[in-house]
Regions:
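Active-site and adjacent substrate-binding regions of carbohydrate-active enzymes
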Residues: 1-136
Length: 136
């Protein structure tokens, strides 16, 4: 999840019953100084900023923005990067734990994207030059 991307350096797949051997071990994530949950306000501020950075990059890029369910709400799988066998609290939505500022930020970017065509291609990319002089 997006929240896990900024909260964990390592996978935490113990609940999957495979001794944490399943799932990719190279997460390409960064915990910003604390593995998992924290009360450190500096770490929490940085994590929130990074989530907004990632959402903005996604929403302002060309193509169809793809979010994992709950990324806009701050959903976490507690560092489990392979929740394939988890039909339980780990992968369910927790509507009582919605990150309202992140949801509002994501909604504002979705509105911006919808209202300004510059953030959306009007035609499918075909590889041809955009300007006449590039391919004339």
């Amino acid at each position: 999840t997006l929240r896990d991307l900024v909260s964990y350096n390592d996978k935490h797949n113990d609940a999957n019953g495979e001794d944490n051997n399943d799932g990719e071990s190279h997460n390409r994530s960064y915990n910003h100084g604390v593995e998992g949950p924290t009360d450190d306000p500096d770490v929490l501020t940085l994590r929130a900023r990074q989530q907004r950075n990632f959402i903005a990059t996604l929403m302002l890029s060309q193509g169809v923005p793809m979010l994992l369910h709950g990324d806009e709400l701050g959903r976490t799988q507690q560092g489990n990067n392979n929740g394939y066998a988890q039909d339980n609290e780990l992968t369910w939505m927790h509507w009582d734990a919605v990150d309202q500022p992140l949801l509002e930020f994501t909604a504002a970017l979705a509105r911006l994207r919808r209202e300004h065509p510059t953030f959306r291609r009007s035609r499918f990319f075909n590889g041809r030059p955009v300007r006449r002089e590039e391919g004339a």
